[in-house]
Amino acid sequence: MAKKLSKNQQKVRALFDANQAYDLHEAIELAKKTSYTKFDASVDLAFKLNLDVRKADQQLRGSVLLPKGTGKDVKVLVVTNNPEKQKLATEAKADFVLDAAAFEQKLKEDDYNFDVIVADPAMMPILGKYGKKLGPKGLMPNPKTGTVTPTPEKAVEELKKGKANYRTDKAGVVHSLIGKVSMPTESLVENAQTLISLIKKLKPAAVKGTYMQNLTVSSSMGPGIKIKLEK
C-alpha cells in the first residue's frame, strides 16, 4: 500500500514535475521552494554514477572547497601534541585546540560540541582507540578529506571558508552539501558547478559507458529535483 503523503508533502509535490529534469538554476530554485522545515535546511547534490563500488579505485571520497561557502558556521576541533601546531591552529581560529590527554578526556565525557576533528598524523593511534565512538557520528578524521594532516592550521582555514565532503555510498551515489536554503540561488549554483566539475574529473579510468547517470538536488527532508545532464 502506498504511503500517504502529509499535507506539506502534497503541497511540495504540486510545485514540480518529479519526472522532469530542470536546468541547474531552476532545479536549485525548486529545491529551495520545496523546503518546508522550520530550520535553515541544507541543500545537497546526489550523483548516481556508473561505479562498481566493490573496487577500491571506484570509491570516490574527498572534499571540495565551495567558492561561496557552506552557509554553516563549522566548529573545528584540532588535536595535536605539537606546541607550534597548537599555536598555528589557534591563530587559524580553530574552536578547540587540544592535546591528546585533553582530547581523550573530552571523548570520555561524551562532549561532542564540535562538527569536525582535524588531527596531526601522530594522533592516529589515539583516534583509532575511539573509532567506534567517532565513526558512527561521522567524526573520524581521514587523510582523503584533509582532516588528517601535518598542517592542521590550513585545514582549519579551509573548513572555515566552506569545505564540504563527498563520498560514494553502497549504491554508487555520491552525496555532498552545497549550502543552505537561505543562501542566494546564484551562490548555490556556483557551488554546484564547482562540485559537478570535480566529480566529472574524478571519473575512474575503468568506467565504461555513461558515467553520470542521474543528478538531483534536494533540501533537508525535501524531494529530489532532477537536474538536466550536459551532453
Curated annotation (Swiss-Prot):
Originating organism: Mycoplasmopsis synoviae (strain 53)
Domain of life according to the entry: Bacteria
Name the UniProt record assigns to this protein: Large ribosomal subunit protein uL1
UniProt cross-references to SUPFAM superfamilies, sorted A to Z: Ribosomal protein L1
Higher taxonomy: Bacteria, Bacillati, Mycoplasmatota, Mycoplasmoidales, Metamycoplasmataceae
PROSITE patterns: RIBOSOMAL_L1
GO cellular component, one term: large ribosomal subunit
Task of the protein: Binds directly to 23S rRNA. The L1 stalk is quite mobile in the ribosome, and is involved in E site tRNA release. Protein L1 is also a translational repressor protein, it controls the translation of the L11 operon by binding to its mRNA.
HAMAP family associated with the record: Ribosomal_uL1_B
